[in-house]
Amino acid sequence: MAAIITPAIPQDLIDFLHKYRVFLIAGHKEPDGDCIGSSIAMSLFLRRLGKETVLLSAGPFQRPEIQAYEALFSAHVPDALKERPDEVGAIIVDCSGIDRTGDLAEQLADFPSICIDHHATNATKSVGSLVYADAPSTTFIIQSIIEHLCGSVTKEEAEMLFFGLCTDTGFFRHLDDRSGEVFAYTARLVQAGANPKYTFAAMNGGKSFGSRTLISRVLARMKPYYGGKLIVSYETDQDRQEIGVENRDSDMVYQLIQGIAGVKAICIVRQDTETHCSVGFRSLDTVDVSSIAASFGGGGHKQAAGLYIEGTVDSLIPRFVEAFASQLEAAS
């Protein structure tokens, strides 16, 4: 596979950034650190250019590491901007398009927009958009844009860009030998003022006792398939009600399961409501979970993907196990 490189910045994207006076910046619903870091860094950068920005998110801000930023975001497009759409552009970050922004989608539909993203399942072809699937995070692409136009990032921008990069790389655990340029980018962020020690503490500290109890339940329900190559588990709405937490620290769960000898892929199903589940897939090296997620209407990356789907834990798990057959039976 080719090395990760600095993406070419389309002139149409540059023209889009210069064209409008006000920008609406939105990411996917259920945001993570890359989504939030990309949004805030882009906002800071555009304000440097003399633009006005409005940060938007449908939420919810369930992840502890992003909750400090919730107050910066609005769930609605200001009414005043709806009356002058010719002055306003929308930038959709870390997702394939407006339809992934949840309840914001209808509000954003009337504004001209571009997409900046790194998900492998993103098929956006709109003029001015920049999708680079090899990028380790959307913040990597945002950093490329800022450095292309301004030469360097500010301390505040560096902190948010570093936060997003660390989120999607598992604090660099998921990077491989193609990633030399990523570490060069990282060095520039640290030189600009990003603090790795502080960022790690912010991302991994402050977890509740209940979140660890919920992790223990997920681990206790693990079931192996395909000779242990696939591990499947789940959590229920009753779990969260009994324990009193909404977030189980997903990254820690996947990290613990990936440490089991022979594991190539993981599937964790969360019963969100009586009728719908959210599903997370993770893999090591060869298994492409983005294609599996896409087959159920979801998306993501080769080694990390997910979806929100109608169904129950009991009805969905057999379907997900079967979906891995072509890849894991071939790997036998």
Predicted regions, residues:
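Glycine-rich, phosphate-binding/catalytic loops in enzymes
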Residues: A41-S43, Q107-D110, V131-Y132
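Short alpha-helices
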Residues: I116-Y185
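Acidic active-site catalytic centers that drive phospho-/nucleotidyl reactions
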Residues: D32-D34, D94, D117, D168
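Hydrophobic helix-and-loop "lid/oligomerization" segment in the mid-to-C-terminal part
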Residues: A2-E30, G37-Q67, E83-V88, T167-S295, ...
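A generic local secondary-structure boundary/capping motif
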Residues: D79-L81, G102-A105, S129-V131, C150-S152, ...
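Active-site cofactor/cluster-binding pocket
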Residues: E70, S74-G128
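A generic structural signal for residues located within well-ordered alpha-helices
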Residues: G33-G37, D134-S137, E157, D249
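Short glycine/serine/threonine-rich phosphate/pyrophosphate-binding segments
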Residues: G33-S39, I98-T101
